[in-house]
Amino acid sequence: MKLSKLLFILVLVLSLTGCKEYGEKRIVKLLTVSDDKISIYYYDYSADKPSYSVAEKENTGIENTLVQLLSDHEYDLKLCRYVVCDSNIIENNIEELFNGLVNSKFSMDTVIIQGDTDAEPEKYTELKKYSYPIYSYYVENGKINGIVENVADNTKNVISDSKLHTILTQQQSFAFDIIKNNIDKGTYVFEHNGVQLSANLENITVFCTVKNDTAQIKVNAMLKNFKGMPSNKTSKQQFMEIAQNSIENNIISLLDDRYMTEKLKLNWFDNLCSCNAVDIEVNLK
């Protein structure tokens, strides 16, 4: 086979598949979720002429369907600002939806919206043109407790950066509540000089503050009902250190590879939101 023919075939293959160096460049702008289907709207830059396209699958479970949908091609999720859901998804499946977004590594800039999933996608591409209600939920004692922000009315809304920032901050608290609710609140047992000691871990609170796109996490925990607590001051201090290390290790184990780059460093959503070190405070009383 002649060299010129080989070069022609190589160029043809690259033009059909997209050069590996640049990737496929499918930029997702919108995700819609209904009972029937999940759709992603994206700009396809892999072709010679960029085009607005849609990919969708039957909704057989939000988390699994999202994984299947996003595995068909290489998508860039950094600019996906909106997730539009039917009202019953918001009411009945909000936690499953949020878990799906976390597992699929959607941007922290993504705002969950109750709206019309059959509306024209152009309605969602520019914030100033958007007129559907935007909801932000907060979690208390492991339960979704209500609507924090509802900017819906019958006119078009221009949402200020500060208001949007408030919504994003409360969306982030969702993720940290997931961490909090998975921390084992059972009895911790320690060995100290051959003596078995124990205490109950209670009153865990996870705080998150966001400033200039940087998140600071603080975890407060409390140990109570000590059994076998040494009376010696030095031994008591050693016990406290052992207890604190045990709690910290328990919390760290929850921050798996999706969130961690190194010990106590978080890497939320591929550096889209840079985070400081986790600040773990343990109150031992």
Task: Report the location of each language-model feature.
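Membrane-proximal alpha-helical signals and transmembrane carboxylates
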Residues: 2-8, 16-285
